[in-house]
């Protein structure tokens, strides 16, 4: 089961346009790292207090949106796919104005 999850995680890729105008795929985590690098560079040494929540919201909201579309709004199925209980899913959907 863990091996299956790892293989599934490898499927989380992003298509990007490289310098030679070719579309390539790279792991989602690499795109997140690059976005964080860019964000931190823009801070120019200043501190920020809510980075965890900011990043979580940027990933969590679209993930919830897509999983709810995929499950056709079935919260029980969505919660199972996400590995969280349905009550937690409902709280998260409410947080983002989705439920």
UniProtKB/Swiss-Prot annotation:
One of its GO terms (molecular function) is sequence-specific DNA binding. Gene3D superfamilies: Homeodomain-like (1.10.10.60). Keywords: Activator, DNA-binding, Transcription, Transcription regulation. Transmembrane segments: none annotated. Signal peptide: none annotated. Residues 75-94 bind DNA. Activates ribosomal RNA transcription. Plays a direct role in upstream activation of rRNA promoters. Homodimer. Belongs to the transcriptional regulatory Fis family. NCBIfam families: PRK00430.1 (NF001659). This is DNA-binding protein Fis.
């Amino acid at each position: 089961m863990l091996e299956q999850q790892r293989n599934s995680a490898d499927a989380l890729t992003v298509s990007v346009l490289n310098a030679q105008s070719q579309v390539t795929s790279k792991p989602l985590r690499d795109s997140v790292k690059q976005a964080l690098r860019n964000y931190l560079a823009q801070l120019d040494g200043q501190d920020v207090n809510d980075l965890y929540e900011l990043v979580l919201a940027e990933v969590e909201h679209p993930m919830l949106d897509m999983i709810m579309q995929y499950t056709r709004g079935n919260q029980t199925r969505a919660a199972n796919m996400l590995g969280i209980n349905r009550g937690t899913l409902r709280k998260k959907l409410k947080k983002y104005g989705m439920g």
